[in-house]
C-alpha cells in the first residue's frame, strides 16, 4: 500500500471524518424532521 494517493490531496482520514459527520448530520436532520412532522411527506 503506497502513500502516493495522499500526496498533494486531502488526507483520507480527514475525508472519512467529514463524510462521517455529514452522514450523521443528514441522519439527525432526517430523524428530527420525521419526528417534528416535517419529514413525514418524504
Swiss-Prot record:
GO terms for cellular component: chloroplast thylakoid membrane; photosystem II reaction center. It is a single-pass membrane protein. The chain crosses the membrane at residues 10-30. NCBIfam families: PRK02565.1. PSII is composed of 1 copy each of membrane proteins PsbA, PsbB, PsbC, PsbD, PsbE, PsbF, PsbH, PsbI, PsbJ, PsbK, PsbL, PsbM, PsbT, PsbX, PsbY, PsbZ, Psb30/Ycf12, at least 3 peripheral proteins of the oxygen-evolving complex and a large number of cofactors. It forms dimeric complexes. One of the components of the core complex of photosystem II (PSII). PSII is a light-driven water:plastoquinone oxidoreductase that uses light energy to abstract electrons from H(2)O, generating O(2) and a proton gradient subsequently used for ATP formation. It consists of a core antenna complex that captures photons, and an electron transfer chain that converts photonic excitation into a charge separation. This is Photosystem II reaction center protein J. It comes from Mesostigma viride. The gene is psbJ.
